[in-house]
Amino acid sequence: MEEKIMTNNSPWILTSSTTTTTTILLSLLFTIFIILRRNKSSSSKMVWPTGPKTLPIIGNMNILGGTALHVVLHNLAKTYGNVMTIWIGSWRPVIVVSDIDRAWEVLVNKSSDYSARDMPEITKLATADWKTISSSDSGPFWTNLRKGLQNVALSPQNLSSQSKFQERDIIKTIQNLKEEAKMNNGIVKPLDHLKKAMVRLISRLIYGQDFDNDEYVEEMHHTIEELIRVSGYARLAEAFYYAKYLPSHKKAVREVLQANQRVQNLVRPLLSLNSPTNTYLHFLRSQNYEDEVIIFAIFEAYLLGVDSTSSTTAWALAYLIREPNVQEKLYEELKNFTNDNDRKMVKFEDLNKLQYLQAVVKETMRMKPIAPLAIPHKACRETSLMGRKVNQGTRVMVNIYALHHNQNVWKEPYKFNPERFLQKNQDGVDGKAMEQSLLPFSAGMRICAGMELGKLQFSFALANLVNAFKWSCVSDGVFPDMSDQLGFVLLMKTPLEAGIVPRM
């Protein structure tokens, strides 16, 4: 019915169409009011740390955009304190910690109190109903799954046995980069090459088999990219209670379901492989988990392992391009070591002997922590923070980026300076303070399960790529863009392009 407004010696009279619309709007506003009141009531049982002033419905969302979230929160902490409350929408407060002492309280000293997770609802579709290491609350299931990954697939013996295969992989990566450079006037995009090498490595640890055929590697790589793309919708639903009813969110659910099916189609046929006893697949099957749990435990290893290591390596190469003196100093260390030991490449057993390499690795992870906000923790019981009561269910986020850029710990924190890790004492700041503040893999009981693998592969790839090539800008004076893009991990907003010249 067409909407009309009539005057008839009486107040404004609205036709049925307008009345219906008004009723719906009033009902919606009333519902939102009840939800906000309910959440405000439940939140009032504890005294929340101070934070920015909130707006109705959107909370603090108006000040959280414009740049990477971890940087915004780091800057806000300078005004509101190193323990502050941020409202993601008007119904989800989160305590943000940017201080090393409070971070250790949450992550280490009271690790079991803050060991639960609070994941966006849409992530259920890609985690077998939150039955993966990163998504599940701590408990017997989580403990068993984590031990299986760390003590079986990622055991020191197993990682050591991979060295000859990884040496072959890096030789193949170097050859592929040479071929790409030959076809593109010396210009390469290294990220995809690094990702495919990581897919191969993780595949061997999971299945105990080598994938010489690139079809599985390509498909897994593409599936990871697709799931990362659609996961961005989860943030909208996390911020606004009614966002899950929007067409865009429903579309996202359909796309995640499609990605879910792709994962299952990719992994399920491999569940029947006759895998060795030292593989992740063998462990998972021995626990009699449902197939879906096994499939997404396997996919999680790819999801969190591939992008994290390859992106960190790309960040390091970008810094070395911007700091040619650092690159040459690193190359001199690598060249002298390989010459002295009559080797053409750096091997795994060499990595801890190369002090400057390890300094570059640490400085890259300090500057660009792969998970700058980690995965938010949730209090699984009533506990405390700074002596103040914290309710069960409270979300706490530790800003790793802020810890890594604290000027009281790090001299010139925004400068890429590997030498800081080679100095016993820098202007009164001791090495212990730096060690405690450097948490690229988080800390405590929920520290990254793949930490050792990540550090080894990053160091190994970086050493051999710098030993093989001189890395430079694609054109004079055009340095790599160091802008962040935060997805599952911290990515380069503009994927790295570089000029390479073979050194040998």
Curated annotation (Swiss-Prot):
Temperature dependence: Optimum temperature is between 30-35 degrees Celsius.
A Pfam family per the record: p450
UniProt note on tissues of expression: Expressed in roots and at lower levels in stems, leaves and plantlets.
Named cofactor requirement(s): heme
Localisation: Endoplasmic reticulum membrane
Catalytic activity reported: (S)-cheilanthifoline + reduced [NADPH--hemoprotein reductase] + O2 = (S)-stylopine + oxidized [NADPH--hemoprotein reductase] + 2 H2O + H(+); (S)-tetrahydrocolumbamine + reduced [NADPH--hemoprotein reductase] + O2 = (S)-canadine + oxidized [NADPH--hemoprotein reductase] + 2 H2O + H(+); (S)-scoulerine + reduced [NADPH--hemoprotein reductase] + O2 = (S)-nandinine + oxidized [NADPH--hemoprotein reductase] + 2 H2O + H(+)
Primary enzyme class: oxidoreductase
Protein residues bound to heme: 448
Superkingdom, taxonomy of origin: Eukaryota
Residues spanning the membrane: 16-36
Function: Methylenedioxy bridge-forming cytochrome P450 involved in the biosynthesis of isoquinoline alkaloids. Converts (S)-cheilanthifoline to (S)-stylopine, (S)-scoulerine to (S)-nandinine and (S)-tetrahydrocolumbamine to (S)-canadine. Can be involved in both sanguinarine and berberine biosynthesis. Catalyzes an oxidative reaction that does not incorporate oxygen into the product.
Family from the record: Belongs to the cytochrome P450 family.
Name of protein: Trifunctional (S)-stylopine synthase/(S)-nandinine synthase/(S)-canadine synthase
Organism for this UniProt entry: Argemone mexicana
